Amino acid sequence: MKLELERPRQCANYSLAVCVLASGSRGNAIYISDGPTSILVDAGLSGTEIKRRLTSRGLSPQDLDAILVTHEHSDHIQSVGVLSRQLKLPVYLSRKIEKKASRRGPFYEIRTFQHGTPFQINNLVVHPFALPHDAADPMGFTITQNGRRIGLATDLGIVTPLVKEHLKDCHLLIIEANHDPDMLLNGPYPWPLKQRIQSRNGHLSNQQSQNLLMALQHSQLEHVILAHLSETNNAPQKALAELSKALTRCKPRLTVASQHHSGEVIYLK
């Protein structure tokens, strides 16, 4: 398998394209496409900003087919309703998330699912799985097309056996590396917030993510994107240094998703 970084109009015959539009506590959104079908995973920025970041990478908002929601926190659903109505997009989410996310509606169309039960958005096969986080029904996803598999798990406090099972054998991973424990402990956050972040329903530390990546590495893993980094309690170079230690059996490209600008479009052929 060959991985390339190019603009969409310059790349042909790919199985999956991925672009992290934003990642962090101020807003999250990920673009995934197989060409005929394009989706957003979360829409945690304003609709205007999401469309701007898409077009900055040569991606057309008009080509979107659906929005897939991980959970109902505002940094993941801020413009779900707006984009759904403007672009006439169905919104895929669980019933528990739907109840909590209704304040962002109305939605153009709602399609519900439950974790553990795979479903399809055209030719994209989506497998949702439960994550431990302080939300109504937080989800991770694997998305598969033509034998290529993307794994996505952010906003989780611990790595469960279920998480490892679903994320194994992916060709591209987007995983959380939220904080450095020492930076969090010595940082400005109030103690209750520090406790929440470190709890089993909080966010993964660099060390926890390192252990996860160590378990998931395999010869066909080509790209790892570190996501949801805290701007206060972590630093990109610190996260990269920690996570690179896990990669003893393979050498995927390891990058950090940004809060402030969209990443490159990554193609899996």
How would you label these PLM feature ranges?
Residues K2, C19-A29, T70-V80, E98, ...:
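Structured catalytic core of nucleotide-sugar glycosyltransferases
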Residues A22-S23, A43-L45, E72, L131-D134, ...:
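Active-site metal-binding loops of divalent metal-dependent hydrolases
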Residues V41-G44, L64-E72, Y92-R95, G151-T154, ...:
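Active-site neighborhood of phospho(di)ester-bond hydrolases with catalytic His/Asp-centered motifs
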Residues G47-L93:
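Active-site metal-binding motif and surrounding structural segment of the metallo-beta-lactamase
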Residues P161-S258:
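Cap/insert and terminal regions of metallo-dependent hydrolase folds
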